A protein has these predicted regions:
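N-terminal organellar transit peptides
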Residues: 1-145, 156-316
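Flexible, glycine/proline-enriched loop segments at strand-loop-helix junctions
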Residues: 151-153
Length: 316
């Protein structure tokens, strides 16, 4: 938003004041530790989506936010260009998100590993389920907090059927289409059995990709991975017994493991932040995290009214 004031003085002057929030480049901040080597904490929080993360509830001019995928790539590029970065700690607190966003995050992390040749240790926090766990599969090692909820390996499609309420209101949607199934999944009519089967085939295919990745990255037999991927959630202890994770520990334990994997005895723990963004310790959240209310409403914002969405998401 730009305000323009015209002042009639000796010569006409125009003063332009730009009140639009500006996104500034990331800065590096050391939150603890010492030495030349660096361990960078990268955060994945909230619903994984390529949508802009503008506040759902805000008063006045909302602060500038950067979409999660944009921020992730920006952080990984900054880390890969720094020869002193010896390890990445990927802190995950997410129930998952869209299939595509989850897969892009996994791919970006794998590309970083290939380029930078530094270990990635995933630290699972409150929830690292479905797409959150999918992203963790890119790590060299997965460590869960003792109270982490993970798993929910599977695919879901959510849509809305408003036909009943519209019928009661005497409203009807008029659709002109080129083919019988062009509007399949529309909220204005129910699915036919044939269309439900079509959607199920898509779900099964996307689910198969998830299961294949679990089997490959966790070195599990495909039938075992498929058995674990029925959508249920697991505690940290259950996930460890099922070989879905490598260890249980706290964030300091993860940092110690990162130092060991990097082959250094001491290192600076580094986060990337925007100017004025508060990140004084390794527990501080990045700007994309949002408030608790925003986190609760984020799945609704992700789904929107744009039709069916295919999700790697745990949303009880």
């Amino acid at each position: 938003m730009t305000l323009v004031f015209a002042l009639d003085l000796a010569a006409c002057s125009v003063i332009s004041v730009d009140l639009t929030p500006r996104v500034r480049p990331l800065e590096e901040e050391t939150v603890e530790g010492r030495g030349d080597a660096k361990i960078v904490i990268v955060e994945l929080a909230g619903v994984l989506s390529d949508a802009e993360s503008a506040p759902i509830l805000s008063v006045g001019n909302p602060p500038a936010r950067v979409p999660l995928l944009v921020r992730l790539r920006e952080e990984l590029m900054k880390a890969s260009d720094d020869s002193k970065v010896r390890a990445i700690v990927l802190r995950i607190n997410s129930p998952g998100g869209t299939v595509t966003a989850s897969d892009i995050i996994y791919r970006e992390l794998m590309l970083f590993r290939e380029k930078a040749r530094v270990p990635i240790i995933a630290a699972l926090m409150d929830v690292a389920a479905s797409g959150g766990y999918y992203a963790a599969l890119a790590a060299d090692s997965i460590v869960a907090h003792p109270t982490t909820i993970t798993g929910s390996i599977g695919t879901i499609m959510l849509t809305v059927n408003a036909q009943g309420p519209m019928d009661k209101l005497g409203l009807a949607a008029i659709t002109v289409k080129s083919g019988e199934h062009k509007d399949m999944g529309s909220p204005f009519r129910a699915l036919t059995p044939e269309e439900r089967q079509m959607f199920q085939s898509v779900i099964d295919d996307l689910h198969g990709q998830f299961v294949k990745l679990v089997a490959e990255r966790r070195r599990l037999p495909r039938p075992t991975a498929a058995r674990l991927a029925d959508g249920r959630i697991y505690t940290a202890e259950q996930a460890l017994q099922l070989k879905l994770i490598d260890a249980i520990g706290y964030l300091p334990d993860v940092l110690a493991q990162a130092r060991k994997a990097a082959g250094v005895e001491e290192a600076r723990i580094v986060v990337y932040k925007r100017p004025r963004e508060y990140r004084a310790t390794y527990y501080a959240k990045a700007e994309t995290g949002g408030s608790a209310v925003e986190a609760a409403l984020a799945p609704l914002a992700t789904l929107g009214m744009s039709g069916p969405r295919f999700l790697y998401l745990w949303w009880p």
